């Protein structure tokens, strides 16, 4: 058995005493990814998606990215995003939504800066 323990002295990176909050967790099945949807954004939350199986295409902020199993997609608050169903093959994902995230040097509910690729 391998065990890892957190250090007793931990300095959080969160600004202004805010503590991020998990809003939702979803499992997106293969069948769901085959249906057309519209690009959308979340003004008040960050969304993280983990590609469990398959491959396809995903649009984030007007850029189309090839995605495959093992990829993580970061959708900062306010950024347009969604799948491109016609290019998806056996795609399933896990998704979480987080709010109240404030990291130094970034807008609220942003995990990465705009110049970093979200995949």
What are these regions (language model features)?
Residues 1-68, 72, 79, 87, ...:
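Generic protein-terminus/edge-of-domain signal
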Residues 78-101, 109:
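Ligand-binding loop in jelly-roll beta-barrel domains
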